[in-house]
Amino acid sequence: MFTDVVELTVSSGKGGQGCVSFRREKFVVNGGPNGGDGGKGGDIWFKCDNNTHTLSHFQKKMHIKADNGAPGESSNMSGKSGVKKVIIVPPGTQIIDMDSEEVLFDMLIDGQEELFISGGRGGLGNTHFKSSTNQRPTYAQPGEKGETRRIKLDLKLIADVGLVGFPNVGKSTLISTVSNARPEIANYEFTTLTPKLGQVNIGDFESFIMADIPGIIGGAHEGKGLGIEFLRHIERTQILLFMVDLASYRDLKEQIETLKAEVGAFSDKLGSSKYAIALTRADAVAQDEINDLVNSFMEIVGVKATSNSNLNFDKNLPYFIQDSADETLGYDREIPYFVMPISSATNKNIDPLKHALFNLVQTNRIYSK
């Protein structure tokens, strides 16, 4: 089961009680105090781990506690400190205070560690309270209480490219074709019920991450369908690939306008993201119809077919791609970076799609450094 939001109560450990003890040695009458200090309570830490992909290992309303410090001992021996509790979370997890709603930590990088709550200090043993007027103190400090906080863990997946489309538009087929992801694929709507990440390799040494989320329908930002729960998983993505089905019963203009409207209504940031458009299922449209269909769609989004790319597009199909993915060299973010018909079933234009998306990703990485 994919879990992306959990509420937890977390408590650091209580400090150990200081010890009341006196020297007991042969020929020593009424020995002085030698009570040791209590151990420090265990801390609460968060750690980001690439090997964790969901929050499903947390039980609902779970209470996570660090160990308490051990009491001090005689002979001025301090108690053992409580073992710290390290909470493992996947990359993309935000730690949010339930009372103030403040984002405390944004866990993004594998190996990132953050101290959340320190354990209570151990109490002082009676050795510390010896004075000229009190040679045998019978008092030792109690340990400090640990701290308890209510938090929410909110997982937002981290990807370079987010796929956005109506249900059954071919998102899962595409991500399984270009990456190592293996989502469920079937010929019915809402096959994808949880977000999926896939690594798209470009040659031997380059790659980018693609995210597939459940299909969007009109009204998704208001809670209709499954998309509202998962749109937030592409909030961190810099690039959106809108997928429009050439063979759908839905009008092409209706598809792209609805998708863009839903994304923009959900998040201003998403609405202003760089984007491209893939026209899916090109293999399902007759050859004598597809050129007119693609050209008419390009007119809808305000672009015209080009032929100046070196990405080895299928020469039998019209396509559009901007001259550069770099805004300093003429990239226009008001229009799609590219519009291309594709077929995952026949691999038509799949390689150009991968490389064109990588051009956008690479430019973003350069300017985000």
Swiss-Prot record:
Domain of life where this protein originates: Bacteria
Record domain Obg: where: 1-158
Record's subcellular location: Cytoplasm
Single annotated GO MF: GTP binding
Recorded GO CC terms: cytoplasm
Domain OBG-type G: 159-362
Pfam family, one: GTP1_OBG
Composition skew (Polar residues), residue ranges: 128-138
GO biological process: ribosome biogenesis
Binding site for Mg(2+): 172, 192
Cofactor (UniProt): Mg(2+)
Keyword field contains GTP-binding: yes
Binding site for GTP: 165-172, 190-194, 212-215, 280-283, 343-345
InterPro entries noted in UniProt: G_OBG, GTP-bd, GTP-bd_Obg/CgtA, GTP1_OBG_dom, GTP1_OBG_dom_sf, OBG_GTPase, P-loop_NTPase
Annotated segments matching region Disordered: 126-146
Subunit structure: Monomer.
NCBIfam families: Obg_CgtA (TIGR02729), PRK12299.1 (NF008956)
Function: An essential GTPase which binds GTP, GDP and possibly (p)ppGpp with moderate affinity, with high nucleotide exchange rates and a fairly low GTP hydrolysis rate. Plays a role in control of the cell cycle, stress response, ribosome biogenesis and in those bacteria that undergo differentiation, in morphogenesis control.
Protein name: GTPase Obg
The organism's taxonomic lineage, starting at the top: Bacteria, Pseudomonadati, Campylobacterota, Epsilonproteobacteria, Campylobacterales
